[in-house]
Amino acid sequence: MLTYRITALGRVQGVGFRPLICRLAGAHHITGTVRNEGGVVTIIAQGSREALLSFMGDIRAARPPVEVAEMRVEEIAHAPLPDFRAVSSGGAARAPLFPADLGICEDCQADMKDPKDHHYGYPYTSCTACGPRYTMIEALPYDRERTAMKDFPLCKDCEKEYQSLSDRRCHAESIACAHCGPRLKGWTRERRFEKEVAMAEAIRLAKEGAILLVKAMGGYQLVCRGDRKETAGCLRRMKHRSGKPFALMMKDIDMAKAWAMLSEKEIEMLTSPVRPILLASPRRKVLPAVASRVPRLGLCLPSTGFYSLLAEGIDAPLIVTSANQSGEPMIFRDEEARAYYEAEEDIAGLFFYDREILRPADDSVMQLQGREVQILRRTRGFLPEPVVRDAPSGMVLATGADMAPGFALAGGGSLYPAEVPCDILNERSQAFFLETEQDWEELLGLSPQAVISDLHPAYLSRLLGEKTARERGLPFYTVQHHHAHALSVIAEHHLQGKSLAFVFDGTGYGEDGTVWGGEILLCEGTSMQRVGHLAPISMIGGDASMKQAWKSALSYLAAAGLPSKDPRAPLIRAALSHHVNTIKSSSMGRLFDAAAALLGLGEENHFKGECPMALEAAAMAAAHAPKIFWEGKEQDGRLLWDGRTLLASLLASHGTIEEKALAFHEAIVEMILSSAEHFGLPRILLSGGCFSNQLLLMRAREALQKRGFSVYTNEKVPPGDGGIALGQAWFYLMKNQK
């Protein structure tokens, strides 16, 4: 008889892991205990060697939402144990692992439709495989009395399910039904509703084309039909959202397949417990008021029982978007939602439940890049889980960058990145950013010993970092923007030694004080050498030109000495020649903007990346492309690629707009491949917001791999600024490791 101490790390809390272990122990005739210690599960298991090995094999093979990322095993001496049981939860001895919110599972949806089940018609049913966790937890260990469900005592039926090891709701802390759980309430301008009547009213209003304000799992959302032009247009005006696409919620996977071309992998992503917004190739056209001039359609499946019932009742795609003005913090508190409802006369009804949301979580956004999943927004389904669990020791706060606000906390060998659902342009949003970060410190039990931010001296994220460091008396560090992007890939994959990183994005403060963004970096450890980049040109407007693609185009034409019939061209040339409001830029994002504008695909970015997305959409419609000639040239020890040559060649080429758009993409791939061969390093990193371009990333990866290069990209955090805090934190930990 042997005794093993098994330590399991990963997604093992709030997902029915302890009941699963008890069932597996019984099946393998194992005695012992299982205990949750602050998100790390410790199992004492006694049995024969064969039984123990088989037992551990079944643990490793556990199906989602359980994810055992790491299992440590040691043989110990222990007195004989008579049976196997789950013992009381303990406190956290190391950096904790909190459970994430998970979308409603198929079993709970089936229960809601079964008149014989006591969960029938209940819009907030959940089990160990689904439901809220992160948004309702107060502290570890994860037990009901330390969640927002503590005010909802279990009824007899739910108590029976909670205690039964054979039930999938065993120890599901969010367990509830219509008899004991949070109640659905509905408000209209004239009446108040509850429970089934409120659900029926929500369906009736939405079916008629009304806009609803709905309390979802992680905050309030605006919901309406996606097939009504007037309704979608009204929602745009309400949100002050001129062009950014809306996502559509489909009632089930069959409806999703009718609207988008989905591979088996994309179906798996869409139906996963994360319940993300998936960007996929559209099968049919959507209303221009929903989405236009973008290569992919955002779609999702219901994440809660309420949404499942609503979508089923309406039987049409639903627009679902966060309830706030663009850039403002997501509304998640009831009093704010009621004030918002009262102020917006176009909202026909408010539908909510009487349980508090303790912290917000927006929908995650994902897409498939070839065979690889790419995360574009890492929120519900992931937060607050770490992406690195064996980092160097040290505690640090990284404050990210301004374009996609977020932060990362490090401690106990784990790295926890978080995106904050707002911008940080005003005091209210900045206060929300700091409030969220401090909440995470308390939640995770971490006390940063340093703060690290972006190198840009005027970034608000840096100013917030400096303020935090100053108020707490902590040392303050900075790291260059594109270096941090590269380090985010290195951190994810635990890479050591030299790597050649291509970091392409819209903007980032360079070490020479100019705007970088088309970077080729040699990285090793914490060192970075800029070995190549786009040739810098003088650009009008600095970072402000990010929204005005026409300025990028005219700046490039002026730099190339090419004529333009645009009536604004003389003014731009005059400003450039007199150095009025100009800055040197090597930004790849601005080169994409310039190409889109010169091909007539867009002059303004009404939302981030609009013109480059239009360029990508056009390129994906082409079957072949004219050859565009450009090449890198060595200058002052660096390999420079001149965007003026590329654009001049593009304008002189023959073909349709779509073919020229494809030619532009192929030229950027040629830049990557040729540069990789020039420097000869076998390991290539691709990061930065430009690599959310599906066509660019897929073709670049394919071309590099065909030539024998190993290619690494961001897989656990976004390639854009939403993932940059991870790289910042990694820089500090590596720089200060003992």
Regions found by a protein language model. Give the residues of each.
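Intrinsically disordered, low-complexity, mixed-charge
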Residues: 1-174, 178-185
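A phosphate-binding glycine/aspartate-rich beta-alpha loop in the early core of alpha/beta enzymes
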Residues: 75, 211, 219-282
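A contiguous, well-structured pocket-lining segment that forms one wall/lid of small-molecule binding clefts
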Residues: 159, 170-174, 181-183, 401-439, ...
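Short glycine-rich phosphate-binding loop at a beta-alpha junction
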Residues: 213, 445-457, 681-691
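Conserved phosphate-binding catalytic cores of ATP/NTP-utilizing and phosphoryl-transfer enzymes
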Residues: 257-263, 309, 330-337, 363-364, ...
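Internal gly/pro-rich beta-alpha loop/helix module
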Residues: 314-390, 580, 584-585
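Conserved phosphate-binding/catalytic loops in two-lobed NTP-binding clefts
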Residues: 454, 473-485, 684-687, 694, ...
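Glycine-rich phosphate-binding/hydrolytic loop that grips phosphoryl groups
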Residues: 482-504, 508-510, 549-558, 665, ...
